[in-house]
Amino acid sequence: MFSKSVTLAQYDPDLAAAIAQEDRRQQDHVELIASENYVSCAVMEAQGSQLTNKYAEGYPAKRYYGGCEYVDIVEQLAIDRVKELFGAAYANVQPHSGSQANQAVYASVLKPGDTILGMSLAHGGHLTHGASVNISGKLYNAVTYGLDENEVLDYAEVERLALEHKPKMIVAGASAYALQIDWAKFREIADKVGAYLFVDMAHYAGLVAGGEYPNPVPFCDFVTTTTHKTLRGPRGGVILCRDNTHEKALNSSIFPSLQGGPLMHVIAAKAVAFKEALQPEFKQYAKQVKINAAVMAEELVKRGLRIVSGRTESHVFLVDLQPMKITGKAAEAALGKAHITVNKNAIPNDPEKPFVTSGIRIGSAAMTTRGFNETDARVLSNLVADVLANPEDEANLAKVRGQVTALCDKYPVYGT
């Protein structure tokens, strides 16, 4: 038996204090990590609901447990909404993460040892696209492509490697690539070698939903995404397809192969986020995300910093810190002291170790959710440049921190 009236602060003050401190940090710091965002109060309410109590192995109307009549409604709402959002014929909303969604896609049509062709982690790809340290690189024969000398995705190399290695699956998508990806070109290459085309649009999904980035669904055999990042939902994953060809294989890859019971409270939160993304206001949000990122990149160039690929056409870009004689690790720490949160990130052909790096990754999704516009983005990018110009000057960091505080107070995350 548990108390029905005791609060978290009363029962576990240590944990409550840590949560309160994190809430304060989110309010007082500007979030520029490209994979992070703020969910709405409605999303949090759904995720904190009584649905966390319910086991529901299986799929709507095909459960292995009783009492699922209402969670069936919840999951079907999520399925229908995400299909409408991306123009998909099939959707699985049960993956606990984007990584598990990707694993399920591989497992649905590949066998261990099959060849996959994905973007190199060192050039902006993702761990789950065949990196040697990831299960995708251990189970499958992973071949990687990258960027050309202009730091643009090298489609000629993709085609050459595809013709040479005859992969069973080509993987497109990235975690640190600023430019738009040509899905039609990938489809053309995949068709030349009879490969499945799989796109992981986790970073770009919110922009796709808002009409600010090309939709990969019409071109692909499989599409996955996380539900957080630019899509602004809870942490989780989704699988989408343009038709129902692989429905049975994908469903069984998630359950019972990779997962047991779905997280119904998270699926409810996904449903809320999908409804939010279907609203006209979300299109304006996605547009502003791109504007803010472009403004920041342009301002940083004016301050003498180099942007990988020269510009951004999305929410994200990499800053090459080598001309500044500072590592990504040091830059992340200095910016953190000024209450600007970024992540260190490898740049193409980075001479530094992955935990040090020569770059930082900047994203505009979270700041835009707070209400930052292009004027604020211009101010913020100059504050970033001020820190990078004098990363060890405590007086400089304190000055920037004060200016960041003023910006944050202007745009509270959840307060009024």
From Swiss-Prot:
For this entry, the protein name equals Serine hydroxymethyltransferase
The UniProt catalytic activity note for this protein reads: (6R)-5,10-methylene-5,6,7,8-tetrahydrofolate + glycine + H2O = (6S)-5,6,7,8-tetrahydrofolate + L-serine
Q: Name one Pfam family in it.
A: SHMT
* Keyword Transferase in record: yes
Keyword Transferase listed? yes
Gene name of the encoded protein: glyA
Q: In which pathway does it act?
A: One-carbon metabolism; tetrahydrofolate interconversion; Amino-acid biosynthesis; glycine biosynthesis; glycine from L-serine: step 1/1
- Which PANTHER family does the entry link to? SERINE HYDROXYMETHYLTRANSFERASE
- What residues correspond to the site Plays an important role in substrate specificity? 228
Ordered alphabetically, the record's keywords are: Amino-acid biosynthesis, Cytoplasm, One-carbon metabolism, Pyridoxal phosphate, Transferase
Which residue positions does N6-(pyridoxal phosphate)lysine occur at? 229
Tell me, what is an example of a GO biological process annotation in this record? Answer: tetrahydrofolate interconversion
EC assignment: 2.1.2.1
Q: Which GO terms describe its cellular component?
A: cytosol
Q: Which cofactor does it need?
A: pyridoxal 5'-phosphate
Role, per record: Catalyzes the reversible interconversion of serine and glycine with tetrahydrofolate (THF) serving as the one-carbon carrier. This reaction serves as the major source of one-carbon groups required for the biosynthesis of purines, thymidylate, methionine, and other important biomolecules. Also exhibits THF-independent aldolase activity toward beta-hydroxyamino acids, producing glycine and aldehydes, via a retro-aldol mechanism.
Gene3D superfamilies tied to this protein: Aspartate Aminotransferase, domain 1 (3.90.1150.10), Type I PLP-dependent aspartate aminotransferase-like (Major domain) (3.40.640.10)
Origin organism lineage: Bacteria, Pseudomonadati, Pseudomonadota, Betaproteobacteria, Neisseriales
UniProt source species: Neisseria gonorrhoeae (strain ATCC 700825 / FA 1090)
User: Of which family is this protein a member?
Assistant: Belongs to the SHMT family.
Q: Which GO terms describe its molecular function?
A: glycine hydroxymethyltransferase activity; pyridoxal phosphate binding
The residues that hold (6S)-5,6,7,8-tetrahydrofolate are 121, 125-127
- Report the subcellular localization: Cytoplasm
Summary of subunit composition and partner proteins: Homodimer.
